[in-house]
C-alpha cells in the first residue's frame, strides 16, 4: 500500500498528525483518509476493468476485420469463435432498434404524404387569379 515510503517516513507523518490534529481528532482523520484511499482504489479498479473490456472488444473487432480480409476461408478455430461472438453481440444490440424503427417508419410517411399533397394543391390554386 505504501510503496516507496519507509518506516521512518510513516513515523514522521504519524507524529506530525498527532501534533497538528491532536489525540482526539487523529483517529477520525485516519479513518476518513483510509476510506478515501479505499474509494480511490475501487475507482481505479473500475476504470481498469472497463479498459480491459474495451480492449477485448477492440480485439474482436480486429479479428473480424482479419476474417473479412481473408474472405472467411481457412479460419482458425479461435478466430471463428471470435467472429461468432461478435456477430451475436451485434445482433443483440441491433434487435431492439429494428423493432422500434419499423412501425415508426411505416406510420410517418403515410401521415406526411397527404399533408404534402394538400399544401401543393393549395399553392397551385392560389397562383390562379380568382375570376
Swiss-Prot record:
Residues 68-131 are annotated as: Disordered. It is found in: Cell inner membrane. Disulfide bonds: none annotated. It comes from the Bacteria. The keyword Nucleotide-binding does not apply. Keywords: Cell inner membrane, Cell membrane, Membrane, Protein transport, Translocation, Transmembrane, Transmembrane helix, Transport. Its main location: membrane. One of its GO terms (cellular component) is TAT protein transport complex. Residues 68-83, 116-131 have a biased composition (Polar residues). It is a single-pass membrane protein. The keyword Transmembrane applies. GO terms for molecular function: protein transmembrane transporter activity. The chain crosses the membrane at residues 2-22. GO terms for biological process: protein transport by the Tat complex. Part of the twin-arginine translocation (Tat) system that transports large folded proteins containing a characteristic twin-arginine motif in their signal peptide across membranes. Together with TatC, TatB is part of a receptor directly interacting with Tat signal peptides. TatB may form an oligomeric binding site that transiently accommodates folded Tat precursor proteins before their translocation. HAMAP family: TatB. Belongs to the TatB family. NCBIfam families: tatB (TIGR01410). The Tat system comprises two distinct complexes: a TatABC complex, containing multiple copies of TatA, TatB and TatC subunits, and a separate TatA complex, containing only TatA subunits. Substrates initially bind to the TatABC complex, which probably triggers association of the separate TatA complex to form the active translocon. This is Sec-independent protein translocase protein TatB. It comes from Shewanella pealeana (strain ATCC 700345 / ANG-SQ1). The gene is tatB.
Amino acid at each position: 500500500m505504501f510503496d516507496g515510503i519507509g518506516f521512518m517516513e510513516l513515523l514522521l507523518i504519524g507524529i506530525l498528525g498527532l501534533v497538528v490534529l491532536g489525540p482526539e481528532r487523529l483517529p477520525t482523520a485516519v479513518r476518513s483518509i483510509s476510506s478515501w484511499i479505499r474509494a480511490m482504489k475501487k475507482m481505479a479498479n473500475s476504470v481498469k476493468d472497463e479498459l480491459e473490456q474495451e480492449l477485448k472488444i477492440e480485439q474482436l473487432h480486429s479479428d473480424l476485420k482479419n476474417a473479412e480480409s481473408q474472405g472467411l476461408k481457412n479460419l482458425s478455430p479461435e478466430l471463428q469463435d471470435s467472429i461468432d461472438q461478435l456477430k451475436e453481440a451485434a445482433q443483440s444490440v441491433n434487435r431492439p432498434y429494428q423493432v422500434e424503427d419499423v412501425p415508426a417508419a411505416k406510420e410517418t410517411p403515410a401521415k406526411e404524404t397527404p399533408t404534402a399533397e394538400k399544401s401543393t394543391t393549395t399553392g397551385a390554386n392560389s397562383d390562379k387569379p380568382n375570376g
